[in-house]
Amino acid sequence: MSPARFESRGAASAPTISALARKSPGPSPSIAACTAARAFMKAQDSTDLTRVGPGTVMGEFMRQYWIPAALSSELQADGDPMRLMLLGEKLVAFRDSQGCVGIFDHRCPHRCASLYLGRNEESGIRCVYHGWKFDVRGNCVDMPNVPARQEFKDKVHAKAYRTTERNGLVWVYMGRQQESPPPLPNIEANLIPGNEIWCLQRECNWLQALEGDIDTSHVGFLHVGMLKPEDLDDDHPMRPTVINRAPEYEVRNTDWGTMYGGFRTNDDGQMSWRVAHFMFPFWTQTPNARFSSRAIARAWVPMDDHHSMLFDISGGVDEGNPAYVSKRRNGQPLYEKFEYEPNTNDWHGRWRCRDRAHNDWGLDRQSQRDGTQYTGIGNITIQDQAVTESMGPITDHDWEHLAPTDQMIARTRRRLLLAARAYRDSGELPPGASDPDTFMGARAGSFLFAPDAPLEQAYQAQLEKAVRWTAQPEERA
């Protein structure tokens, strides 16, 4: 599929950025907003935001959306079933003889033996305890231990969830509308054939993991704190961040969630923007790619309250994320690569990096002292992993003192909490739950624009010039 520009569906229905009045410069509004944000994070608020199991406020909200579950490459036709932990539920995933994916509660509905032990063969998964067999929709198709005149397989169903696949990603819908699920969201990065997807498990709650993506002021310290402006070429995408490590922000509500624009004036007087998004219920778009030519999306999928799985999806018409592939002026790479542990078969055995809490994430104090890395940790992803996991399995929000540069975090928490409680109280959901094109209003990245232009003007001008990708008809199991 060749790149195509996304065409708006008309002013009345196009995804929008909420028009918020600009406040005059000065510390008072930001400080007041941050004080209010800290007060708002009461114990019940924190619980409602972070807990994701069945029956929880956030867990039930997330179940109304399609959820990335696995890479398509992880499941082979008639291959080994895979344990899958999602939203606190222990599931089993498999691909049948026809290539369709099934995702079930791992317990056989007969006597609760785990279907992970089962035989994936001849268009279904068979429990090894008594031989009961189920197709990908959870229908019992064989009950061989029961005499034919007594069998009741038409009345037995495994707890199966709807699945679909698109461009290398397996999706699952865990909500109530199993017979009529909502449309698959048009997350632009997932619309690009041949996109790049990688996964990484994080041993902490999903919220603190996600918030690292929408906290742009940490970049000047955690990731490039060791650099001076003269270390980078004049056109290096990270140079404005190194020159000015304390950006100003504009934050907006959007139909898809929230967005921020972090801005700094560069050497020639232009405004350097870094724009990023939060998209309901657990997606981010980070500002590290080129806005005009590359789409990126990152899903922070809760496995349970203490573990999350990152699905990083990107694609475009350039060479990739400049923050990862770029070098210093002297030709030395900015970051090292990280290594994975071999995947195992336990509930938390997939996509773990080698450097984790057990070895202080590979911290090298000499590297920290001599300026090789500000953190002493050589990989940019593991730098993020270290600080978010070091907060504990679930951050104790009562300890926090949010700063003016945390506006995006405070706004996103508020949006999430209000949306999840609105669904609990009235069944109301944000637009993206039913309108898949809502998410097409979001594109992240860095760009230069004329000084003094408001965020909306700069963003819309760049969006109109950007290469876009559109959806193809989806397929569902």
Show the residue positions of the predicted features.
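Cys/His/Pro-rich metal-binding microdomains
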Residues: 106-109, 125-128, 141
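C-terminal catalytic domain of Rieske-type non-heme iron oxygenases
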Residues: 34, 39-40, 54, 100, ...
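A structural signal for short hydrophobic beta-strand segments in well-ordered beta-sheet cores
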Residues: 93, 120, 132-134, 162-163, ...
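Short Pro/Gly-enriched beta-strand edge/turn motifs at strand-loop
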Residues: 63-77, 139-147, 277-284
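Short cysteine/histidine-rich zinc-coordinating motifs and their immediately flanking basic loops
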Residues: 119-124, 138-142
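Short acidic (Asp/Glu) patches
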Residues: 143-158, 293-294
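Low-acidity, Ser/Thr- and Arg-rich intrinsically disordered low-complexity segments
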Residues: 2-18, 22-30, 35
